Amino acid sequence: MTKKDLGYSLTTYGRGKTGYKTRKYVEGLLTKEQALRKAIKLCTSTNLVDIDKDWETVDRYGESEEHSRTFGTVHMVKRKTGNAYILQTFDKDGWESYTYDLKADGKMTNRR
């Protein structure tokens, strides 16, 4: 594993009836999978689950050179079939989105 594979910085937030909740950050030299798992754990442990279906990204980094490091944003959305987590990563080529469904057995499936 190279250093290029590490360095994901993730933001999680919940949007409920009272507006956006406090943002929590997970930073460090992590792989995408590690960062996603940490962010999901943070989401569930802090009850950040109230995002309605018209969720939107409110954090836009990568606009300047100082934020050119690869990072991601995790959104947790409620679905009829269960919880789904949207992982958006940003790099020099732009935005990429992945959808992970958290199954009952705790395993994630990438539905990109």
Where are these regions (language model features)?
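Short, mixed-charge low-complexity intrinsically disordered segments
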Residues: 1, 44-112
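A general secondary-structure boundary signal
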Residues: 8-11, 38, 42, 95-98
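A short, exposed loop/beta-hairpin motif centered on an aromatic-Gly-Thr core
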Residues: 18-32, 99-101
